[in-house]
Amino acid sequence: KDGDKILDIGAGAGEYSLYFARKGYEVSALELADANIAAFKKKLTPEDKIDLVQGNALDLSRYADKSFDIVLLFGPLYHLKNDADKQKCISEAKRVCKDGGKIFFAFISNDFVFLTEFGYDVNYFSNGDYDKETFKLNDFPFVFHTVGAARKLLADGGINILHEVASDGASELLAARINEMSDEDYTQYLRYHFYICEKPELLGMTNHLLFMGEKK
């Protein structure tokens, strides 16, 4: 709603921060990587009122308790490898979120990446970097979660999940065909995507997962 304060943790090069700031929201952005900070600053204009700082998602001590209406975690859980760090990240996001505020969590989905990679490499199933018994991907610095693992992580972190979304579905796998679509077909494709993206039976069939939650 108008006047909401948003914290973008792991803001990358600023795509989400800039979008919301230019919609009139009060945005604070925190990013760790030097290259991303530099890219973000290049996009800023004098009209962009964004509090951009360099910092770590595991330490949000610069922000007061219950100071944001919306907290975005659209990157850190792609890269944090051990559960203690993941839970620390979630705990800090909860701490700075107002009671009744919303927290958005993004994950890279483990299970569909196999088909996406197969689209690039016909031999992926024999030579891909994954556990051939459990089908758990190994591609650090990227970290992958199944739908079940993401749910458990958030539940263990005291998050009440409100929405679960297959963010991009098969869009990378089908990118070449999608790029050939007419505007009319693409509009209908998007309608189809939004029709299926929260269906429980299809949640794992995506490269990225999005969860919206609130503090329990």
Please name every model-derived segment.
Residues D4-G10, F104-D129:
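Conserved class I S-adenosyl-L-methionine
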Residues E15-D59:
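Class I SAM-dependent methyltransferase SAM/SAH-binding core
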Residues S61-V71:
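A short acidic, Gly/Pro-enriched loop at the edge of an enzyme's catalytic core
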Residues I70-A84:
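A short SAM/SAH-binding and catalytic strip from SAM-dependent methyltransferases
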Residues Q87-D99:
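A short glycine-rich, Lys/Arg-flanked "PGG" loop and its adjoining helix->strand segment in the class I
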Residues P141-G158, E164:
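Short alpha-helix
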Residues H163-K216:
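A C-terminal cap/extension of S-adenosyl-L-methionine-dependent methyltransferases
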